[in-house]
Amino acid sequence: MSEITLGKYLFERLKQVNVNTIFGLPGDFNLSLLDKIYEVDGLRWAGNANELNAAYAADGYARIKGLSVLVTTFGVGELSALNGIAGSYAEHVGVLHVVGVPSISAQAKQLLLHHTLGNGDFTVFHRMSANISETTSMITDIATAPSEIDRLIRTTFITQRPSYLGLPANLVDLKVPGSLLEKPIDLSLKPNDPEAEKEVIDTVLELIQNSKNPVILSDACASRHNVKKETQKLIDLTQFPAFVTPLGKGSIDEQHPRYGGVYVGTLSKQDVKQAVESADLILSVGALLSDFNTGSFSYSYKTKNVVEFHSDYVKVKNATFLGVQMKFALQNLLKVIPDVVKGYKSVPVPTKTPANKGVPASTPLKQEWLWNELSKFLQEGDVIISETGTSAFGINQTIFPKDAYGISQVLWGSIGFTTGATLGAAFAAEEIDPNKRVILFIGDGSLQLTVQEISTMIRWGLKPYLFVLNNDGYTIEKLIHGPHAEYNEIQTWDHLALLPAFGAKKYENHKIATTGEWDALTTDSEFQKNSVIRLIELKLPVFDAPESLIKQAQLTAATNAKQ
């Protein structure tokens, strides 16, 4: 194969690892790089409204496909994206951040270029990103550039953390051997140390053998680090009761007869709390124990027999086995577990959320009814995205269909995240299956931060469902502090004017205020098909919130007030 430009090499490599959409914005230090996207068949440039939204979109895309790329320009562009990149770092999402930077000669001369701080320091932004990246590289040598690109792509995928790649403008068009593309990037994990893994498996088997009431608890990193299949098989083979955390929604099949619900410490349903906390063995997969994921750290296991499977270590009771990756540990555990669980006597699992009682069609829509009812509308394989606030808490009441994807930023909690994430997820879903539905639930306050990205959805003909929960302001903040404070109020928008304002030609608008209107719309066979982009405004009472959010707000307020 003949020589190709370094820029084309980057995008060919990304295409090889199943990245088909590139997010970001143009800027004069990355324009030559962006030209190369159009030289690679099967790639498209999303062209976002701003860099923060682009970072959110890259995050949403990577949560579905395992890897994404964001391209920004030096200084002003890359810094605008860093909130989104920090969220990806916190929540284990593999985003490669590619930054077009000034030429090597301009940096050497310390020229006072635009987009700099005016002090000749061209490394300051790179250093900022280093704190929220698994690895970084500023390319300075064309000879080693291809191997550095390969290293960053591999690291981003394997660790499911962001990486930073700085590409000087003068290197993008330099040539590298095209033959390097013939050897694929190795995305496989290194095997576990056999002795350490054997000790883990033997110890876990002994704990299982001596337990009478074990449970499985699936969390965020079961999805992020690609052990959903192993976790589901663990449930199938053992028949142990299985639960998820808020961040674990979508990591196991919630239609499975052994699924018991969402465990959030003191915020759990009483029967779920009792089932998990009375267990004599907890098998925890991919735990991410943040405050909102644990009911403000209110886990209260009665047993000390807890096994935590993590991406790069396993913890058995008080012993930590560094370097024992859960992917292989679970796979090898599954080979030997059937003989150990033969004598297991199945215990009942908590009843799933009961259906709503019949109410008159004129009944005003409220959150408690909405989230229970939503399960009826969802379909197998849906991507369900819930914004920080009432949606992220309410969705825990909803039972997901099989093979659903759940996206919610419970740890980082940057309001407005889900608009961009919906765009990214919609691109990814379209690439997997054009009929796959992407469904967003976002509050009226959060939407105002990132609404511009709806225009990108329209531009590309994407067809998500955009459910806007309109309850007049920042409800979660009102519940925590300042229920009538002016700073928790927002300007009222005409939500049904948004799609045409952004230039949509084919779209649907709906406004729902009663349970009857919800039922009529969500049971309509045409509405159930993702044929056009839709915005559905849900009119809800002020201060209406899921019970779990009200309790969490009280816990958060108490935590904030502690001296």
Swiss-Prot record:
CDD domains: TPP_PDC_IPDC, TPP_PYR_PDC_IPDC_like
Application notes: Fusel oils and acyloins are important flavor and aroma compounds in yeast-fermented products contributing to the quality of beverages and food, e.g. fusel oils in whiskey, contrary to common believe, seem to alleviate hangover. In general they are desirable at low concentrations, whereas high concentrations may spoil the product. By adjusting growth conditions and substrate their production is sought to be influenced. Due to their broad substrate tolerance pyruvate decarboxylases are important biocatalysts for chemoenzymatic syntheses, both by fermentation and in vitro, e.g.
Name of the gene: PDC6
Positions of Mg(2+) binding: D444, N471, G473
Listed GO MF terms: branched-chain-2-oxoacid decarboxylase activity; indolepyruvate decarboxylase activity; magnesium ion binding; phenylpyruvate decarboxylase activity; pyruvate decarboxylase activity; thiamine pyrophosphate binding
Residue sites binding thiamine diphosphate per the record: T390, G413, S414, I415, G445, S446, N471, D472, G473, Y474, T475, I476
Cited PROSITE patterns: TPP_ENZYMES (PS00187)
Residues noted as binding pyruvate in the record, renumbered to the chain: D28, H115, E477
Name used for this protein in its record: Pyruvate decarboxylase isozyme 3
Cross-link Glycyl lysine isopeptide (Lys-Gly) (interchain with G-Cter in ubiquitin): where in chain: K212, K233, K269, K505
EC code(s) of this entry: 4.1.1.-, 4.1.1.43, 4.1.1.72, 4.1.1.74
